[in-house]
Every structure is written in structure tokens, then in C-alpha cells.
Amino acid sequence: MPLKKLESSNNQTIIAEEVALLKEMLENITRRMIGDDAFTVIESIMVLSEKQDYIELEKVVANISNQEMEVISRYFSILPLLINISEDVDLAYEINHQNNTDTDYLGKLALTIKDLAGKDNGKDILEQVNVVPVLTAHPTQVQRKTILELTTHIHKLLRKYRDAKAGVINLEKWRQELYRYIEMIMQTDIIREKKLQVKNEIKNVMQYYDGSLIQAVTKLTTEYKNLAQKHGLELDNPKPITMGMWIGGDRDGNPFVTAETLCLSATVQSEVILNYYIDKLAALYRTFSLSSTLVQPNSEVERLASLSQDQSIYRGNEPYRRAFHYIQSRLKQTQIQLTNQPAARMSSSVGLNTSAWSSPASLENPILAYDSPVDFKADLKAIEQSLLDNGNSALIEGDLREVMQAVDIFGFFLASIDMRQDSSVQEACVAELLKGANIVDDYSSLSETEKCDVLLQQLMEEPRTLSSAAVAKSDLLEKELAIYTTARELKDKLGEEVIKQHIISHTESVSDMFELAIMLKEVGLVDQQRARVQIVPLFETIEDLDNARDIMAAYLSHDIVKSWIATNRNYQEIMLGYSDSNKDGGYLASGWTLYKAQNELTAIGEEHGVKITFFHGRGGTVGRGGGPSYDAITSQPFGSIKDRIRLTEQGEIIENKYGNKDVAYYHLEMLISASINRMVTQMITDPNEIDSFREIMDSIVADSNTIYRKLVFDNPHFYDYFFEASPIKEVSSLNIGSRPAARKTITEITGLRAIPWVFSWSQNRIMFPGWYGVGSAFKRYIDRAQGNLERLQHMYQTWPFFHSLLSNVDMVLSKSNMNIAFQYAQLAESQDVRDVFYEILDEWQLTKNVILAIQDHDDLLEDNPSLKHSLKSRLPYFNVLNYIQIELIKRWRNNQLDENDEKLIHTTINGIATGLRNSG
């Protein structure tokens, strides 16, 4: 019997009760705000939406005044948000229940390690596996931080629903508190008045570490070690999960990312993790009241206690407390040294006893900062050993064990920061350096071979830098060199791990990578033997992915590159772009090209004796590589995951996965289990069939790519259709991120960033990037020969990659709505442009029919009943928002709204994104 997934709970009764209660409270609050007469409009809208009487719904919405629109759009935006919270609460409950009752589920770590423990290389795999979720600031998290904080309070209250219902806590008081928070959220601005700055994005993402990720990663790593030990495997400091971050270092297309934001990103991380340690030490100080008259500590604990400046007269016989005080004092000095300021108390989870803890360091016996996390851990280990010597092993568990594990994982910062820049920027900077040094006057005009010759000569034979104080530099070059200089300083200060990778967007040639090496050399991060920052190419378009094999083969053939890779444990990371490849060639072409590229790049690495590891640039939507993480990882090519995998976590996905520590634990558990299972298991039923499967896919994908590009790039009306029949213009003005919607002025589809492209197709409910071109391509293959449908059905049943590919299309189609999409099409100004919709509609219907035929299903989402039920319960609410949005866009474009009313459109964008849950 296959194990069930816990993607969402099956306890629909509880969810229904909670949603009914939340809806009742929201209705009462809204009635009080607008009155009974106005609320009847909301009630009539709901009835029409549930009956799917969209013609009448459109008429009613058209007669709502701008003033009434504000509360009505807010109501229908808040309602899906409350439903989300209820579902998340129940998922967290289900996760705890399954773990505490020792129930098996798909991806459960205990099962994964049990299966692996019996293999000869099981211990090696468990020690080496490393999964790295990389949190990014891509602008798809439309909710304000304030709204997220309020939803956290509601989440905590709903966790108590069962207790309130059973009378364990006072039901009436519980209802009153819940009502208060819903009232607050209903009367709080949903949309930001001003665009986020990078510093806001850094601060915002830190709340996930402070609130859930530190605890979840620490708990999971401890459980990982304990499970291995249970099966006789003693692991030496494994790191199954470490975190990565782009915020503050990703300057591709974002002029607001600077040397200052890079420094701030690292500094705030140190502040948060050191505050966490300080809080833990405060808790240990309060509880470790062991008296030396009863338990004699070892000499090292006595030494630590003697160095404490705790002035309390009551601590004379409490050496452990004084030892913890001394350690905490050193942490405070460390925080001052690393952040250049005292603790800012970003968290308030544990207060400090200032009379005992704030004693200043005396001049005679100054408290010194820790030189490294190793020294901090050594002091904790001394306390652990003393407890073991006295038979107090039980006292080690809890806060002491947790903080020791956290030090092993995080050290003095939370996540390794990636730097990223577009290859064209690097080329411009290198061209300026070479010209200023009188080496090459017009570098950009050289051939690829000539470029590599010039760059290699500088890297291998010239120890001096190209830049000189005597030569004036452009603002761009100054800014880039400042960022690299800051990176070097941070590595010197916080350790090599704080910045490990630099990603090159739009890598198209070997010279792109050597150009980055030149820039790194300028600040001392690269020399002939060593690269302190790994050079990571990002292959994004279909063409670049097709060329990736040859590019990497040429790059890896150079001796200097092999020297650099050798300093990185013989790993070479390659980033794969899901977004641009999809925008370039459609869903099938993107997915298949990425699959083949991994196979080819893995083989090239083996030829050169290099371990190729992949960094998957996945977004929240299927059109940007999204979908269930477990399925996405286990459907990767066998052999493509060595012992390390990185993947981006973006936008609203961060809140969905990591907003709660229990759900965060579960998602991290899925990532580890999926990675291990993919490393050791050939998932396909019969590996001998893979060659024939590949031939079939090559044929289908070629057709799909042609069909997709014919509409997107060859139809002269498609560009206007996208810009007129979607809210792209309104999305671009929404204050949801620090980065512009395009790298330059948008004059064609290729110039638009993938995120607003996908986000806008989600808003108009076409979900175009997740399915267009799929139906016609499969239909052509099915019609080509008798038995082809059966072949596709067999592939779906036996090949995880193909199964995942089609399941994602199934999910996307279920969230689309062609009736609503038709209404958006009417926003287009000319009939020729509006007619593009009918091409899309025909392909949508064909895709739905073909997908169901291959799956042998009667309806969409037959394999995912919980999502099907969830969508059924929420669709009426956010379908209304689409009709409201369409009406508001009409008014806005016809100058019937003033600038203050534009936020009404933004409110609907927020609500639709909230209802869909993975929109960008």
C-alpha cells in the first residue's frame, strides 16, 4: 500500500468548522463596517459566484461604487487568507499527530534512514548529504509583514480550537481573542504604501529564522543523528540541512543591491543567531541551579565560573549558572565585534535579568569576544562533559543540546549569501579594466577564443590587478568592485562559508566565467591556485541549456579551473533556470531540456573527474519549476544528485513552507528524504525503457516548442494581448519587491522578467506558462500511430519524471478558469487582439482532454483530493475577486479611478494571489 502524502490534512470536518467560524466573524465585522444594506451586496455576489452565474455577477459588480469596492474587495481578499490559515493549522496538527503516533507517511525521515542504514554506503551518504533551501526576495510575496504577523496570531489561536471546543480552555474568551485579531486584520492596510527596500527584505526574511527555521533546522538535524544512531550509525557532525540566501547579494537587475546591503545581510544574520544563543543562555542560566555543595563540577566549569562577572551574592555555590553567565558575556562581546553594535533584540522570546547579565567587563579582567564558533562550542562541551561525569546526562537534553546543535549548524551566521550578477555587466566591467590598463582597447569586439586568451593570460601569468587608483572608474565598476571587496572582508570576518558562490546570470560562454574570475582576482578572492568564491554559471534559456554541455566541457578542461575546483572539495555547482527557459519555450520544452541538461552535465563532470552539483532556480508556480518538492526532487535524473542539492524558495512559498516551525520541519524533512531516495534509488520501474522514453519525449517536446513559440513570438497580436488582457501594468506598479519588473524598458516579451510574466498569467486565471503547447504536442504524438496513447499511459505509470510533469499540468489546469479569462480578454482594445484568447482556449481544452486521457482519469485532481476539496471551498471567494479586478481595471484604464483608488486593484491582486497560494 503506497504511503500517503501530508501535503494537506484530510480532516476536512475540522477545517469546515473553522472556516465557518472565521467566515461568521468576518461577516459580522464587515457588517459593522458597512451596514446591513451594503452587506447584502456581498451576500448576493457570493450566491451568484457559488451558482457560477457569471453573467449576472458581472452586472452586479459593474454597479458597485468605488467607495463600496474598498470594503468588498477587502472582504474577499481576507476570506481566502483565513481559509489558508485554517488549512495550515490543520496540516501542522496532522504532522504532529503522525509523528507522535509513529504513523508512516511519504518522505518520513525515520523510514528513509531505516532503509538507508542497511546499505554498505549508508553511513557515508548520511554524513555527506546536504540540502540547501535558498531564500530569495523575488517579488511574489504580496502581503505586508504586518499582515503576516497578524496571521501568525490567528494561526496560534486556531491551534487551540480543539481545546476550546472540548472545554479545555474557555471557549468564549478564545472566540473573543480570535475575533479581535480578525477585526485588526480587516482594518489594516493590506498593501504597502511604498515599495520595499532591500533592507526591508532582509529584515522580513529574518522573521522566518527567528520564528521557525532555527528551531526546525536544529530539531531536524538532532533527529537525523538520533535516527542514524538508532540503527548503529554514529555520524560525525552531519549537516543534512543548511540555509542559503540571495537577499542583499543578488544584484541581477536590481540596482538597489550594493556593498552596503551585502554587509547588512551578513550583519543582521549574525545579530539574529547571536540573539538566539543569548536567549538560550538566559534560559539555561535560570534553570541550571545545581549547587556545588551537592554536585561537584569539573575543573573547566569551575574555571568558566571563576571568570564570570555575575555580581549576585546568591550564585556563589552555583558554578553552572556563573559559567553560563560568562559564556553569555562573551557572546555579547562577540555580537558587538561582529555587528559593530550591541544586541538590538530582534526577538523577544526570552527576556534577560539585566541585574545579573549586564555587568560591564572590568578593565582588570575584560570579557573577550569569541574568536570563532569553535571556541564557543568548546565552552559548551566543557559543561556537557561535567554533566556526564556526574551522571547528569538527562540535563544535557533540552536547551543545552539545542544550542550546541545550533552552533554546529549555523556558527555565527544563519545562511550562506549568494552573490549574483548578469554576465553583460561583468563583461562591461572587465572591458573597462582592460582598456584602463592599456591591454585591450575594445574587449567586447573580440571573438570568444580571443576573449578567453586575454582573460587566461591575466589569470595565469599576471599577478598584478588591472585596476589602478590613477585611472578613473565608472560608477558601475566602482560599485561592482566595492561589492567584491565587501565580500572578501565578510569572509575574513565571519568565515569562508558566509559567501561561497557567485552566480552568473545568462551564462552563454566560457568567457563569462573567466570575466567573473577577473573581477574576483581584483580584490584577492581568486588567484592561480585558489578560488575563495565558487564561480557558478546559470543556464536559463533553451538555447543556453542546449549549449551548457559544450560550455562546461571547455571550461573544465583548463588547469586553472581544476585548481579552483580542487579547493572546493572537487565540486562544481551549476545553476539551472526554470523561469526563463519556460518563457522561452513553454512548459514541456523547459522541463525536458532541463532534464537532459542535467544528464549531459553530470556526464561531463564524470569525464573530467569533477562532481557536478545542481542549484535549481525554481519558483512557486509550475511555470517556474514549482510543484510538490518531494516529487520534483525524486523525478530528477538518476545520478544528478550526488550528495548536495540547492534550490530556491521564493516569494509566498517561503511563508507557506516556513511560516510555522512544525510545517517548516515537515518541508525540510521532505527535502532530505527526497534527496536521499533519489541518490540511492533508480525510481523508474524498468531502467531499460528510458532510452525509448527519451525518444518519445524528444519528438513531443519539439512539437510543443514549435506550437508555443508560434503563438508567443510569431503572432503579432500576442504581445498586446498579454499587456492588455492581463493586469501586468498594475502588477508592475504593486509595491511587492525592491527589484524592477524588467531589466530594461519593456518592448518585447523577452525583456520582461519571468516573475511578473507568470504572476500576471496567474491573475487572469489562464496559467499560460504551466500548460500551453502541451495538448497539441501530445495529440500529434497520439495520432501518429495506434498504441501511442497506451505508451504515454505506461510512461505516466512508470516514470516519475513524466508523472510529475503531467501532475503539475493537472494542478495548473484545475486553478485556471476560462470563463474568467474570457472577461479579461475583453479588456483588449481591438478584436484582433481579443481573438488571441480563442487560440488559448482551444489549446486549454485540448490539453485538459489529453492529460485526463493519459492519466486515465475522469476529472482533474483525482490524485490529489485534498487540493481538490480546498479549491472547491475557496474558488467562489477568489473568483469574485477576478470580476472585481476586471471592473476596476476597466475604470482605471478609462480614468474613472483616481490615484488613491489604484490600491483597490492591488487589493484584488493580493487576494487572488492568496487564494491561489503559488502565484509567482
Curated annotation (Swiss-Prot):
<dbReference type="InterPro" id="IPR033129">
    <property type="entry name" value="PEPCASE_His_AS"/>
</dbReference>
<dbReference type="GO" id="GO:0005829">
    <property type="term" value="C:cytosol"/>
</dbReference>
<feature type="active site">
    <location>
        <position position="138"/>
    </location>
</feature>
<dbReference type="GO" id="GO:0015977">
    <property type="term" value="P:carbon fixation"/>
</dbReference>
<comment type="function">
    <text>Forms oxaloacetate, a four-carbon dicarboxylic acid source for the tricarboxylic acid cycle.</text>
</comment>
<feature type="active site">
    <location>
        <position position="583"/>
    </location>
</feature>
<comment type="similarity">
    <text>Belongs to the PEPCase type 1 family.</text>
</comment>
<dbReference type="GO" id="GO:0006099">
    <property type="term" value="P:tricarboxylic acid cycle"/>
</dbReference>
<dbReference type="GO" id="GO:0006107">
    <property type="term" value="P:oxaloacetate metabolic process"/>
</dbReference>
<keyword id="KW-0460">Magnesium</keyword>
<dbReference type="Pfam" id="PF00311">
    <property type="entry name" value="PEPcase"/>
</dbReference>
<dbReference type="GO" id="GO:0008964">
    <property type="term" value="F:phosphoenolpyruvate carboxylase activity"/>
</dbReference>
<dbReference type="InterPro" id="IPR018129">
    <property type="entry name" value="PEP_COase_Lys_AS"/>
</dbReference>
<dbReference type="InterPro" id="IPR021135">
    <property type="entry name" value="PEP_COase"/>
</dbReference>
<dbReference type="InterPro" id="IPR022805">
    <property type="entry name" value="PEP_COase_bac/pln-type"/>
</dbReference>
<dbReference type="InterPro" id="IPR015813">
    <property type="entry name" value="Pyrv/PenolPyrv_kinase-like_dom"/>
</dbReference>
<protein>
    <recommendedName>
        <fullName>Phosphoenolpyruvate carboxylase</fullName>
        <ecNumber>4.1.1.31</ecNumber>
    </recommendedName>
</protein>
<keyword id="KW-0456">Lyase</keyword>
<keyword id="KW-0120">Carbon dioxide fixation</keyword>
<dbReference type="GO" id="GO:0000287">
    <property type="term" value="F:magnesium ion binding"/>
</dbReference>
